[in-house]
Amino acid sequence: MTGFATSAAAQDSTQTLQQALKQIPQVVLSAPAAMQVFFLDVQAWRSLEKAGPSADGMRRLSIAQPIRPLESIGFGLEPWSANAKVPFDEVSYFAGFGQAPSNISYWGLKDKKAVGTLVASLKQGDFAAVDGDAPGLIANDGEGKMNMQKANQKDPWRGMMGKASFVLPLDTALIQASSATGMKILAQPAPSVADSEVVAASLAGLKEGVPADRGRIVQAAVISPIMGLAAVDPAKVLLSTNGDADIAKQNLKAAVEANGRGIPPYFSGVLADAQINNLPAVVISLAYADCATAKQAVDGVSAAWKESMAGAKDAKVAGTTVQAGKLCAAVVRVTAPKAENAGNPVLAEVMNRYMRREFTVLQIGAAR
């Protein structure tokens, strides 16, 4: 196990991710899901292939897949851009949370002016102002409506089922939802996901794991302890926004005893797809109460990776701990030996196992 070579540059590779998380209300972190927030840095992903996405580049988008506007990019970025009323390459990031059909998506643009321009373009089409709790809300149909005559697989505002979109400008982003419900909460995201102490600790670790002078975060997911507790009731282990950390610790301890071998229970984490020194990598950063526990997690994740991830056995595994305020992050980076295309074989192995419920690297349990 080796740590990371530290970079003299004080840049921050998590800047765009933090910008996205600042727009999302912290209440999202109480959702009983393993992956609570999804994120794609459009500019980082597009930098992998200047000519346009290949099949490998498209397949790489396994973390960001649930974000609604990305459902329409498989038919090419040009038709997507024409229907979206904004060039794909002018989008800074996409983010989202929740499950279809009630999932919420965020379109991050370069500034407020770009947001105003896009809203004006949408109003020239079939979007119009609608009444709601949040001023500035526009929609292209009634709540829950599907208009098959307007269905268009290449249109991120409609999709193949012609679903309605409700859109709200928020600072330098647009929120896209399938109804006006909850827009009042979304319009005032403070305290945000980025304001969460445990998420901030995970981001501090991620910043170390992806050096800004040599690497970029392509996609990321904010993960909860549910990722490592396949057999445990999610509601019992989540630290709600006004939750009691001591009760959460007790519940986690009980869950650990029921779950078998694994790493110490973490509060929150980030699973990131990155490109570092032109090589695809996966970086995992988990928030802990102290660095002694975080060190156990680094060792445990590294050992579990070598033990269970046969499909990525040639990958280089490195880890470290990062003090983050009162908390400490356990950071493990797994880098592919070479970049054969625009894909990420390490991420593919992680997501394939995750989908089959066989991703045990983050399993919470008694020390290995």
Regions found by a protein language model. Give the residues of each.
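Soluble, non-membrane globular domain cores that form compact, hydrophobic packing
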Residues: Q11-S102, G108-R368
